[in-house]
Amino acid sequence: NYKLNLYKPMVIYLMRHTAVDVPQGVCYGQTDVPLKPTFETEATQTAANLQGLSFDKVYTSPLTRCVRLATFCGYPDAERDDRLKELNFGDWEMHRFDEIADANLERWYADYLHVKATNGESFEDQYRRVAGFLDELRQKPYEQVAIFAHGGILLNAQIYAGIIKPEEAFSALTPYGGIVKIKLS
């Protein structure tokens, strides 16, 4: 039962952006929000955790919170890719979850994997976006890659790599400034 694997093994380090300066309970997704004043302290820790690693390629979400961390960590020329943006919460962006008067929100809470935010995406939509990016990345000759992105992207990359199941996603959320390592073979 020999299975032909056309892909080279690849190690991917995914870094979540640092803490955002948004009131708790506010849905911000793809909105370009400011970072907390603790950015430099948090980013210093992330950079220290990457020390000694080298990457064949570095990518980042185009949102400022990720570009700033990539730049701080020494990668100002990281390639920006829209597929690495956070979940698009559509009409709910920048509203408190407990103040959203949309009947669709209850459906989303009951089945966030499949139900789209009003005029936005579902978690499954975001997964397809991330899987498409990773499928394309696997065809490149890289052995070690860095990606500066968002909590949802890190979760979906772990699902793609078989580390977690979609139903476990939100209990596996990486802290701000945290790093997840996945291996693809």
Predicted regions, residues:
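Histidine-centered catalytic micro-motifs
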Residues: 14-18, 148-153
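Phosphate-handling substructures
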Residues: 73-129
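Active-site-proximal alpha-helix that buttresses catalytic centers in soluble enzyme cores
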Residues: 15-76, 121
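Domain-level recognition of soluble alpha/beta enzyme cores
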Residues: 164-185
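Short beta-strand scaffold positions
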Residues: 60-61, 128, 148-149
